[in-house]
Amino acid sequence: MVHFTAEEKVAITSLWSKMNVEEAGGEALGRLLVVYPWTQRFFDNFGNLSSPSAILGNPKVKAHGKKVLTSFGDAIKNMDNLKTTFAKLSELHCDKLHVDPENFRLLGNVMVIILATHFGKEFTPEVQAAWQKLVSAVAIALGHKYH
């Protein structure tokens, strides 16, 4: 289990409270699909993913990205209990969807990039460290069923 300090929790929640989940979710998932094109195989029912502009403009990518970031909000509300929070999603992604758990780490790293671009100077090294810790812990929790 990962322990978050009070300072880390404040750094995470204060930035999250300013996040536009719909916009950032589509951007994060879209960036994942563009930068790591092999992840597209999990989204073959999303229609046109033939180019970066097609991916970033795809309404299914945006909708699923919002869903992903909404789930990420659950992590922020339950930072002290991530394994339980993501148990069902871990099972779904492992047993039904067969997603490579490495993709969770990649998505977390994309999230950190999105935060940096959206929040600029507010995204200090200390804030980045807190967020990196969180996205790593979420990736581990999502990959739990695989072990």
From Swiss-Prot:
Tissue expression profile of the protein: Red blood cells.
Keyword Signal: no
Membrane spanning stretches: none
Signal peptide: none
Protein keywords: Heme, Iron, Metal-binding, Oxygen transport, Phosphoprotein, Transport
CDD domains, per the entry: Hb-beta-like
Superkingdom classification of source: Eukaryota
Alphabetized SUPFAM superfamilies for the sequence: Globin-like
Pfam families, per the entry: Globin
GO BP annotations listed: hydrogen peroxide catabolic process
GO cellular component: blood microparticle; haptoglobin-hemoglobin complex; hemoglobin complex
Residue numbers bearing the Phosphoserine modification: 14, 51
Chain ranges of the Globin domain: 3-147
One Gene Ontology term of the molecular function aspect: peroxidase activity
InterPro entries assigned to the protein according to its UniProt record, in alphabetical order: Globin, Globin-like_sf, Globin/Proto, Hemoglobin_b, Hemoglobin_oxygen_transport
Binding-site residues for heme b, renumbered to this chain: 64, 93
Family according to the record: Belongs to the globin family.
Record's function text: The epsilon chain is a beta-type chain of early mammalian embryonic hemoglobin.
Complex formation: Heterotetramer of two alpha chains and two epsilon chains in early embryonic hemoglobin Gower-2; two zeta chains and two epsilon chains in early embryonic hemoglobin Gower-1.
Protein name: Hemoglobin subunit epsilon
